[in-house]
């Protein structure tokens, strides 16, 4: 009940998070990311959804290796840029867009130099999430990496903002 009241208060006062996902979808998607790591390599997904005002609502996980089966061949995310056409086709078919991305690290949730230099979607405002520990333990805002792309390979770190930046659960808009 406290969570619902806090959500309604934030919505009513115009303090919307940048990104939201319902609990069931988040749990299923994160479980699948953890499974796909096989505890040996990274995994990741494009987060498809829609922009509602200033809030990005996640509606579906599109796993990197479903689009590019070889993207984890070296243990880290190395997505073949020629496969982006398949991503855009899926977005058109589903009437959604890539509103964020997520990938899994073996340990912490800090961005690696490669993460900072190579955004999956190099668009200002794009959100990149990083789950630590192969998605086995920490999986909720406040314990995961939340990064907003500012352009020119610069990022804003929202990781410490908890659900003020990324909210998992019901959201009214």
Language-model features, listed with the residues they occupy:
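Conserved beta-strand-loop surface patch within small alpha/beta domains used
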Residues: 1-98, 107-173
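Residue-level "edge-of-site" marker
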Residues: 104
């Amino acid at each position: 009940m406290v969570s619902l009241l806090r959500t309604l208060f934030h919505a009513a006062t115009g303090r919307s998070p940048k990104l939201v996902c319902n609990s069931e979808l988040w749990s299923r998607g994160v479980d699948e990311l953890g499974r796909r790591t096989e505890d040996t390599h990274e995994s990741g997904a494009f987060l498809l959804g829609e922009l509602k005002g200033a809030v990005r609502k996640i509606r579906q996980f599109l796993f990197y290796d479903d689009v590019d089966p070889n993207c984890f061949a070296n243990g880290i995310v190395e997505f073949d840029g020629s496969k982006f056409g398949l991503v855009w086709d899926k977005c058109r078919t589903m009437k959604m867009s890539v509103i964020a991305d997520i990938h899994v690290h073996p340990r912490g949730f800090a961005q690696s130099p490669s993460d900072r230099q190579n955004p999956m979607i190099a668009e200002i405002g794009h959100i990149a999430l990083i789950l630590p520990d192969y998605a086995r333990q920490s999986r909720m805002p406040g314990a995961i990496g939340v990064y907003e792309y500012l352009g020119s390979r610069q990022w804003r770190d929202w990781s410490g903002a908890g659900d003020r930046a990324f909210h998992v659960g019901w959201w009214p808009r």
